[in-house]
Each structure stands twice: as C-alpha cells, then as structure tokens.
C-alpha cells in the first residue's frame, strides 16, 4: 500500500516535470486589466509546473532512489 502511494506520487511529479510545452499567460484584453493582480487557479498551476522544471535533477535522483526501494524493500 505504501509502495503504491509512493509510486503514484513519483509518477505524478514526473509527469509535471517533463511537460515540454509553452505555458503562456493570457494576454490582457482591456484597459483596466493590469489593475487586477489576483492569481487564478490556472496561474497557480502554471507557476507550480514551471517550478517543477527547475528541480529535474532532484526528481531524477528521487527516481533512482525509488527504483532502489522498489527492488530492495517492496520486492517479493
């Protein structure tokens, strides 16, 4: 059970880290749009995915650690 949860979390973070498309912000449409500085949910997700890209080396090391754990600890 714990191994399944760790594997799920690892795969989810890997999927976010290897996304390779441009994440653009929506351009303002009107005159007063620059006054609105509230971040939407889409903006927060975009920032999170962009921050994951900077941690690719740590994610790779985590993957190696997880492979080791799957062989040694969770193997039958």
Curated annotation (Swiss-Prot):
Keywords: Membrane, Signal, Transmembrane, Transmembrane helix. Residues 76 are cytoplasmic. It is found in: Membrane. Its main location: membrane. Disulfide bonds: none annotated. It comes from the Eukaryota. It is a single-pass type I membrane protein. The chain crosses the membrane at residues 55-75. Residues 1-17 form the signal peptide. InterPro entries: SMIM7. GO terms for cellular component: membrane. Residues 18-54 are extracellular. The keyword Ligase does not apply. Belongs to the SMIM7 family. This is Small integral membrane protein 7. It comes from Xenopus tropicalis (Western clawed frog). The lineage of its organism: Eukaryota, Metazoa, Chordata, Craniata, Vertebrata. The gene is smim7.
